[in-house]
Protein backbone atom coordinates (compact mmCIF):
# COMPACT_ATOMS: atom_id res chain seq x y z
CA UNK A 1 0.00 0.00 0.00
CA UNK A 2 1.18 3.51 -0.80
CA UNK A 3 2.71 5.41 2.11
CA UNK A 4 0.42 8.25 3.17
CA UNK A 5 1.49 9.32 6.67
CA UNK A 6 4.34 9.37 9.18
CA UNK A 7 3.61 8.98 12.89
CA UNK A 8 6.26 10.18 15.33
CA UNK A 9 6.98 9.47 18.96
CA UNK A 10 8.29 12.57 20.76
CA UNK A 11 10.72 12.00 23.66
CA UNK A 12 13.96 10.57 22.31
CA UNK A 13 12.65 10.55 18.72
CA UNK A 14 12.04 14.18 17.80
CA UNK A 15 14.40 15.54 20.45
CA UNK A 16 16.65 14.23 23.23
CA UNK A 17 14.25 15.32 25.96
CA UNK A 18 14.51 12.51 28.50
CA UNK A 19 17.37 14.24 30.31
CA UNK A 20 15.20 17.37 30.60
CA UNK A 21 12.42 15.25 32.08
CA UNK A 22 14.89 13.86 34.63
CA UNK A 23 16.07 17.37 35.49
CA UNK A 24 12.48 18.57 35.90
CA UNK A 25 11.61 15.62 38.14
CA UNK A 26 14.63 16.18 40.39
CA UNK A 27 14.06 19.93 40.64
CA UNK A 28 10.40 19.31 41.51
CA UNK A 29 11.29 16.75 44.17
CA UNK A 30 13.70 19.22 45.78
CA UNK A 31 11.24 22.13 45.59
CA UNK A 32 8.54 20.02 47.22
CA UNK A 33 10.82 18.83 50.03
CA UNK A 34 10.83 15.21 48.85
CA UNK A 35 14.11 13.38 49.41
CA UNK A 36 14.09 11.65 46.02
CA UNK A 37 16.82 12.05 43.44
CA UNK A 38 16.99 10.11 40.18
CA UNK A 39 20.47 9.51 38.77
CA UNK A 40 20.87 8.72 35.08
CA UNK A 41 21.05 5.02 35.88
CA UNK A 42 17.95 5.27 38.10
CA UNK A 43 16.11 7.00 35.29
CA UNK A 44 17.25 4.53 32.65
CA UNK A 45 15.61 1.78 34.72
CA UNK A 46 12.51 3.84 35.53
CA UNK A 47 11.95 4.56 31.83
CA UNK A 48 10.82 0.95 31.48
CA UNK A 49 7.67 2.26 33.17
CA UNK A 50 5.89 4.65 30.78
CA UNK A 51 4.25 7.82 32.05
CA UNK A 52 5.47 10.28 34.65
CA UNK A 53 2.91 9.54 37.35
CA UNK A 54 3.37 5.83 36.77
CA UNK A 55 7.15 6.23 37.02
CA UNK A 56 6.84 7.96 40.40
CA UNK A 57 4.47 5.26 41.62
CA UNK A 58 6.98 2.61 40.53
CA UNK A 59 9.75 4.38 42.45
CA UNK A 60 7.50 4.52 45.53
CA UNK A 61 6.85 0.79 45.14
CA UNK A 62 10.57 0.11 44.88
CA UNK A 63 11.21 2.08 48.08
CA UNK A 64 8.27 0.58 49.95
CA UNK A 65 6.86 4.00 50.93
CA UNK A 66 6.36 7.49 49.58
CA UNK A 67 3.80 10.11 48.56
CA UNK A 68 0.13 9.27 48.11
CA UNK A 69 -1.40 8.95 44.65
CA UNK A 70 -2.92 12.42 45.10
CA UNK A 71 0.48 13.88 46.00
CA UNK A 72 2.06 12.13 43.02
CA UNK A 73 -0.54 13.77 40.78
CA UNK A 74 0.36 17.17 42.26
CA UNK A 75 4.06 16.48 41.81
CA UNK A 76 3.47 15.56 38.19
CA UNK A 77 1.64 18.83 37.52
CA UNK A 78 4.52 20.79 39.04
CA UNK A 79 7.06 18.72 37.11
CA UNK A 80 5.22 19.35 33.83
CA UNK A 81 5.25 23.10 34.50
CA UNK A 82 8.99 23.00 35.17
CA UNK A 83 9.63 20.88 32.05
CA UNK A 84 7.70 23.34 29.89
CA UNK A 85 9.77 26.22 31.34
CA UNK A 86 13.05 24.46 30.53
CA UNK A 87 11.94 23.56 27.00
CA UNK A 88 10.67 27.10 26.36
CA UNK A 89 14.12 28.47 27.26
CA UNK A 90 15.48 26.87 24.08
CA UNK A 91 17.91 24.46 25.73
CA UNK A 92 16.84 21.50 23.56
CA UNK A 93 17.00 21.22 19.78
CA UNK A 94 15.65 18.65 17.36
CA UNK A 95 17.66 15.50 16.74
CA UNK A 96 19.64 15.20 13.47
CA UNK A 97 17.47 14.94 10.39
CA UNK A 98 14.11 15.50 12.09
CA UNK A 99 13.34 18.96 10.68
CA UNK A 100 14.56 17.98 7.23
CA UNK A 101 12.50 14.78 7.12
CA UNK A 102 9.38 16.65 8.21
CA UNK A 103 9.99 19.30 5.54
CA UNK A 104 10.48 16.64 2.86
CA UNK A 105 7.40 14.74 4.01
CA UNK A 106 5.21 17.84 3.87
CA UNK A 107 6.57 18.82 0.46
CA UNK A 108 5.76 15.36 -0.90
CA UNK A 109 2.21 15.40 0.46
CA UNK A 110 2.67 12.97 3.34
CA UNK A 111 0.50 13.59 6.39
CA UNK A 112 2.08 13.88 9.83
CA UNK A 113 0.95 12.72 13.26
CA UNK A 114 2.29 12.25 16.78
CA UNK A 115 1.74 9.27 19.08
CA UNK A 116 3.34 9.85 22.47
CA UNK A 117 3.16 8.84 26.10
CA UNK A 118 3.86 12.39 27.23
CA UNK A 119 1.22 15.06 27.81
CA UNK A 120 -0.14 17.44 25.19
CA UNK A 121 1.34 20.36 27.15
CA UNK A 122 4.82 18.87 26.78
CA UNK A 123 4.30 18.29 23.06
CA UNK A 124 3.09 21.84 22.52
CA UNK A 125 6.07 23.28 24.41
CA UNK A 126 8.64 21.28 22.45
CA UNK A 127 7.16 21.99 19.02
CA UNK A 128 6.76 25.71 19.75
CA UNK A 129 10.36 25.93 20.96
CA UNK A 130 11.90 23.96 18.07
CA UNK A 131 9.70 24.86 15.09
CA UNK A 132 8.48 28.31 16.22
CA UNK A 133 4.96 27.19 15.27
CA UNK A 134 2.03 25.64 17.11
CA UNK A 135 2.14 21.83 17.07
CA UNK A 136 -1.18 21.73 15.24
CA UNK A 137 0.31 23.67 12.32
CA UNK A 138 2.75 20.83 11.65
CA UNK A 139 1.05 17.66 12.87
CA UNK A 140 -2.47 16.93 11.68
CA UNK A 141 -3.14 14.52 14.55
CA UNK A 142 -1.59 14.54 18.03
CA UNK A 143 -2.39 11.52 20.20
CA UNK A 144 -1.03 12.01 23.73
CA UNK A 145 -0.68 9.62 26.63
CA UNK A 146 -3.13 11.46 28.86
CA UNK A 147 -5.87 10.92 26.25
CA UNK A 148 -5.88 7.10 26.18
CA UNK A 149 -6.74 4.31 28.61
CA UNK A 150 -3.37 2.57 28.47
CA UNK A 151 0.04 4.00 27.66
CA UNK A 152 2.80 2.35 25.66
CA UNK A 153 3.58 -0.57 25.23
CA UNK A 154 -0.21 -0.87 24.77
CA UNK A 155 -1.23 0.15 21.23
CA UNK A 156 -3.86 2.69 22.35
CA UNK A 157 -2.02 5.89 21.42
CA UNK A 158 -1.12 4.61 17.95
CA UNK A 159 -4.65 3.37 17.38
CA UNK A 160 -5.90 6.84 18.33
CA UNK A 161 -3.50 8.43 15.85
CA UNK A 162 -4.59 6.05 13.08
CA UNK A 163 -8.23 6.78 13.87
CA UNK A 164 -7.56 10.51 13.67
CA UNK A 165 -5.83 10.10 10.32
CA UNK A 166 -8.51 7.76 9.03
CA UNK A 167 -5.82 5.48 7.63
CA UNK A 168 -4.96 1.79 7.97
CA UNK A 169 -1.63 0.82 9.56
CA UNK A 170 -0.24 -0.34 6.20
CA UNK A 171 -0.39 3.26 4.90
CA UNK A 172 1.76 4.64 7.70
CA UNK A 173 5.25 4.43 9.19
CA UNK A 174 5.96 4.88 12.90
CA UNK A 175 9.15 6.44 14.27
CA UNK A 176 10.29 5.32 17.72
CA UNK A 177 13.29 5.20 20.05
CA UNK A 178 12.28 2.73 22.78
CA UNK A 179 11.23 -0.87 23.30
CA UNK A 180 7.89 0.21 24.78
CA UNK A 181 7.23 2.44 21.78
CA UNK A 182 8.29 -0.26 19.35
CA UNK A 183 5.95 -2.76 21.01
CA UNK A 184 3.11 -0.22 20.97
CA UNK A 185 3.47 0.57 17.28
CA UNK A 186 3.86 -3.08 16.28
CA UNK A 187 0.77 -4.01 18.31
CA UNK A 188 -1.14 -1.39 16.32
CA UNK A 189 -0.01 -3.08 13.10
CA UNK A 190 2.54 -0.45 12.07
CA UNK A 191 5.94 -0.80 10.52
CA UNK A 192 8.57 0.90 12.66
CA UNK A 193 11.69 2.96 12.01
CA UNK A 194 13.84 2.83 15.16
CA UNK A 195 16.40 5.49 16.08
CA UNK A 196 17.98 4.74 19.48
CA UNK A 197 18.20 7.62 21.95
CA UNK A 198 20.64 8.43 24.75
CA UNK A 199 18.70 6.26 27.19
CA UNK A 200 17.89 3.34 24.85
CA UNK A 201 21.16 2.64 23.05
CA UNK A 202 22.08 -1.00 23.52
CA UNK A 203 18.49 -2.23 23.87
CA UNK A 204 17.18 -5.07 21.70
CA UNK A 205 15.34 -3.57 18.74
CA UNK A 206 15.34 -6.65 16.53
CA UNK A 207 11.56 -6.34 16.09
CA UNK A 208 11.94 -3.02 14.25
CA UNK A 209 11.59 -2.96 10.47
CA UNK A 210 14.47 -0.50 10.18
CA UNK A 211 17.07 0.55 12.73
CA UNK A 212 19.10 3.62 11.77
CA UNK A 213 21.33 5.94 13.81
CA UNK A 214 19.27 9.09 13.17
CA UNK A 215 16.81 10.62 10.71
CA UNK A 216 19.34 12.39 8.51
CA UNK A 217 18.96 12.01 4.76
CA UNK A 218 21.96 9.67 4.62
CA UNK A 219 20.33 7.34 7.15
CA UNK A 220 16.79 7.46 5.77
CA UNK A 221 17.99 6.52 2.29
CA UNK A 222 17.81 2.95 3.61
CA UNK A 223 14.00 3.30 3.64
CA UNK A 224 12.90 3.54 -0.01
CA UNK A 225 9.39 4.80 0.77
CA UNK A 226 10.62 7.96 2.47
CA UNK A 227 11.01 11.16 0.46
Swiss-Prot record:
Pfam families: Hydrolase. InterPro entries: CbbY-like, HAD-like_sf, HAD-SF_hydro_IA, HAD_sf, PGP-like_dom2. GO terms for molecular function: hydrolase activity. It comes from the Bacteria. Gene3D superfamilies: HAD superfamily/HAD-like, Putative phosphatase, domain 2. Belongs to the HAD-like hydrolase superfamily. CbbY/CbbZ/Gph/YieH family. NCBIfam families: HAD-SF-IA-v3. This is Protein CbbY. It comes from Rhodobacter capsulatus. The lineage of its organism: Bacteria, Pseudomonadati, Pseudomonadota, Alphaproteobacteria, Rhodobacterales.
